[in-house]
Amino acid sequence: MDRCKHVGRLRLAQDHSILNPQKWCCLQCATTESAWACLKCSHVACGRYIEDHALKHFEETGHPLAMEVRDLYVFCYLCKDYVLNDNPEGDLKLLRSSLLAVRGQKQDLLARRGRTLRSTAAGEDVVPPQRTPQGQPQMLTALWYRRQRLLAKTLRLWFQKSSRGRAQLEQRRQEEALERKKEAARQRRREVKRRLLEELASAPPRKSARLLLHAPGPVAVRPATLATSRRLSAAALNPRRQPAVAPGVTGLRNLGNTCYMNSILQVLSHLQKFRECFLNLDPSTSEHLFPQATNGKAQLSGRPASSSAAELSVRSVRAQGCEPQGLCWSSGASISRSLELIQNKEPSSKHISLCHELHTLFRVMWSGKWALVSPFAMLHSVWSLIPAFRGYDQQDAQEFLCELLHKVQQELESEGSTRRILIPFSQRKLTKQVLKVVNTIFHGQLLSQVTCISCNYKSNTIEPFWDLSLEFPERYHCIEKGFVPLNQTECLLTEMLAKFTETEALEGRIYACDQCNSKRRKSNPKPLVLSEARKQLMIYRLPQVLRLHLKRFRWSGRNHREKIGVHVIFDQVLTMEPYCCRDMLSSLDKETFAYDLSAVVMHHGKGFGSGHYTAYCYNTEGGFWVHCNDSKLDVCSVEEVCKTQAYILFYTRRTVQGSAKLSEPHLQAQVHSSSKDERRTYTLP
């Protein structure tokens, strides 16, 4: 509710019990879940999804306003809605600030190597309802913080109305205007410098080609110490095999809540067909497809050269106590020197291209030379082309995957249509091949069959899909006091697929059957004959890579989602035969329906608004599974993968020669095509 009149009468006491974390429990049942504090008195009770003691307190006392102590929501029982406004004194805002100050004393437990995981309200913030002397300092801290905010607010208003305050405000405005002018001047200087560099790079070389064939002169180096010279001489006398990184075992540094992007990029790079099509795109020869900076610094050679030092900086990190031999399995932990490649914080070309960034990143990750990459250029390209993911907020990995593939598809289609004359024939052919892989690798088709109950007439519609969003059975959505029976702590993936393809009855008479209305003329003013019907979804064409998105959320209360933390049992081999239409089963070999597990994206945490994403990927080059946790990579077994709490599953079809598509004669009748959504509709008598 935007305006609640009961908030204007709110008067908070400075020693309210909500400021003491030890009292964040129900006074009747002592539970700490969904605790609501009355804003009229010091009473604390549980919500309606626990024992409903807060509502009973309102019925007994008539106090309408209550605040949830962790989510900081305010609810009015008289208005029967959540409150969004505040009283003129701003007490609710100050109260929320005080509670955040109390909770901020325990946030150090969540800091892990420069990355803070924002846990849910039911995380480490829960304090047992014990009366110990430790709660008194926290209450005093909250009271002091609230009084300081009130005093600062009063002094700020008084100072702004004084003559000195107005003069200071005017001076600040002048400084901001001067800073804007300086920034504009700096921007103009950068633009002039960029144009000058472009002109110098495009100018013809002054030296002849004969001079370029000579070997470069000696490079000046710093004088080495005695210990360094001894190590170099020992290495020259006893040459050893240089330490190598296994191809694909390259970590991606977390640049600030970018675990969702890192996990998806690791999965896409481990899908062999998707990876190979982007590796075949060479930016140095495909100039029109990937417009480069004219200074030539965007090219990535086999080893870092001096010309690319402005774009990529190589940092040598020495691991202590490790042997200088063997492959790097977990971001350089088993070798004496691991190389970290740090991309430039701006895209490497004037024209931002996700295809170019994917090519560069995949080439580095599968070169076997880098143990860790900081994907700054990829992140800024995503920010520029997908504004919804701009910033360092927590994001959903499934939404990012869909948006990334959509933008890559749009980019390839626009390059092939708008600049067709300028692109050579070989590059146009290469672009079409990549676009075909992007469009078809996840593309499948569903058969939507609606059966009229009155005349048993069946209408079939073919719809495209790129992933299957599977819902949990109904028993996991029914919450009774937050308790889940022990026999429902696990769910089968096959059960979720069966629920997706089961027959459901449409509510009421809402279906206009073509057979029942066939004798009715179009000019007839009488309404259409509506009847009851059944609907079923079946797989009509299987994709090369099957994406299964597990919808791990349920609604608990009003406008509140929570995660379903049930373990889903999935196998390494998945057979899709039971979920396809019957005509497909008779026309194809059984091996066509077999899928092998390729990757798993896992979400750690109790809610989708916070947590952490990691990925389990199968390395096709080495034949092993690897757990990709940002910059840390560990080899694991398939048994460990199957025990994870999966969020997105990727299965690759074993045989791709046969087309898992139903032939046209099996569905005879009328065919309707739609250019808008590319759907085909078949009707059967």
Swiss-Prot record:
It comes from the Eukaryota. The active site is at residues 259, 612. It is found in: Nucleus; Cytoplasm. Zn(2+) 1 binds at residues 4, 6, 76, 79. A zinc finger (UBP-type) spans 2-99. Its EC number is 3.4.19.12. The keyword Transport does not apply. Disruption phenotype: Usp49-deletion mice exhibit increased resistance to lethal HHV-1 infection. One of its GO terms (cellular component) is cytoplasm. Residues 250-654 form the USP domain. GO terms for molecular function: cysteine-type deubiquitinase activity; cysteine-type endopeptidase activity; histone binding; histone H2B deubiquitinase activity; zinc ion binding. Its main location: nucleus. Zn(2+) 3 binds at residues 38, 41, 57, 63. Zn(2+) 2 binds at residues 26, 29, 46, 53. Deubiquitinase that plays a role in several cellular processes including transcriptional regulation, cell cycle progression or innate immunity. Specifically deubiquitinates histone H2B at 'Lys-120' (H2BK120Ub), a specific tag for epigenetic transcriptional activation and acts as a regulator of mRNA splicing. Antagonizes DNA double-strand break-induced ubiquitination of H2AX thereby participating in the maintenance of genome integrity. Belongs to the peptidase C19 family. Component of a complex with RUVBL1 and PSMC5. Interacts with centrins CETN1, CETN2 and CETN3. PANTHER family: UBIQUITIN CARBOXYL-TERMINAL HYDROLASE, UBIQUITIN CARBOXYL-TERMINAL HYDROLASE 49. This is Ubiquitin carboxyl-terminal hydrolase 49. The gene is Usp49.
